Structure formats: structure tokens, C-alpha cells
């Protein structure tokens, strides 16, 4: 959701800045990942949305469920709960992860394929994409049968569409204009 992204951005940046100061970037990433996963579970999500449960109770429950030990991360959860923003934790995690990758000079890439790719194919694609985008890439692969064939690659806001669906869409657009 674009709205969540806008709301989460300053929280992610502030937390990342503090993590840099404390030299805790990677460990806090793990804590945020757990928080984001727990918040998306059905019972926890309904608890967060329940107005009769006060903010400190919600924060305490989340902290206990995840088993957070770090004082600053606990305080972060308490601040989010106090501002009724616990539901943005998955987006905060996603943006914090992007900041971490950027800090380490790594970009995130998603390869969409109509069919499962072998490890060898993913490796070859990774080499080609690393050269093309002149950066080290953290690659994930997702299967999308509607592509019909070929692949589509997303790196940040750049899209490389080499799928049959993309070619057919381009052909249709050309023929109808």
C-alpha cells in the first residue's frame, strides 16, 4: 500500500539511523522481520485493531511474542503502539531492509518466471543482471504462470520485461495505435 509506504518511511529511516549509530543494523533487521511476520498473523492483527486494548498492552504482547531483548527495538514498538501505527510494521521492515541493502551497496531484484528456474539458470541470470545493473544483486524468484513464457525482472523501479505476455502486450499496443 502506497499510504503505508509513505507513513513507514520516516520510521524506517529513523530506526536505521539509530541502528547505524549502535552498530546493530543486521540484528535489528532480524527483530523487525519477526515483528512484521507476527503482526500479519490473524489473531495478532485483530488484537492490534481492537480499540479497547491500550497501546502499552499491545506493545508488551508483541514484544513478548517476538522475544525482543534490545531496549531500542522495544522502545520503537512502544512508540509505534502509542501512535497507533503497529500495522505498518511490515512496511517498516521492507523499507529498513531496502536501506540495509543500499548501505551494503546491494540492490534487491525479483525475477518473475512462468516456470520454475534451475539453480544454474538463476546463477547465469544473476551474473548477467549484476553486469547490466552494475551492482551486486540480492535475487529472489517468483513464479507467475500468466507470463506464458520468458522472464520479467524488477530491480528497484526498473523493469526488464522479456516475457511472452510483455511481447504480446507491446504488439497489441502497436496494432491498436
Swiss-Prot record:
Location of this chain's protein in the cell: Cell inner membrane
Xref: SUPFAM superfamilies: N-terminal domain of the delta subunit of the F1F0-ATP synthase
InterPro entries, A to Z: ATP_synth_OSCP/delta_N_sf, ATPase_OSCP/d_CS, ATPase_OSCP/dsu
Keyword RNA-binding (UniProt): no
GO annotations of cellular component type: plasma membrane; proton-transporting ATP synthase complex
Function: F(1)F(0) ATP synthase produces ATP from ADP in the presence of a proton or sodium gradient. F-type ATPases consist of two structural domains, F(1) containing the extramembraneous catalytic core and F(0) containing the membrane proton channel, linked together by a central stalk and a peripheral stalk. During catalysis, ATP synthesis in the catalytic domain of F(1) is coupled via a rotary mechanism of the central stalk subunits to proton translocation.
Family: Belongs to the ATPase delta chain family.
Record's subunit section: F-type ATPases have 2 components, F(1) - the catalytic core - and F(0) - the membrane proton channel. F(1) has five subunits: alpha(3), beta(3), gamma(1), delta(1), epsilon(1). F(0) has three main subunits: a(1), b(2) and c(10-14). The alpha and beta chains form an alternating ring which encloses part of the gamma chain. F(1) is attached to F(0) by a central stalk formed by the gamma and epsilon chains, while a peripheral stalk is formed by the delta and b chains.
NCBIfam families (UniProt xref): ATP_synt_delta, PRK05758.2-2
Name this polypeptide is given: ATP synthase subunit delta
Organism: Neisseria gonorrhoeae (strain ATCC 700825 / FA 1090)
Gene: atpH
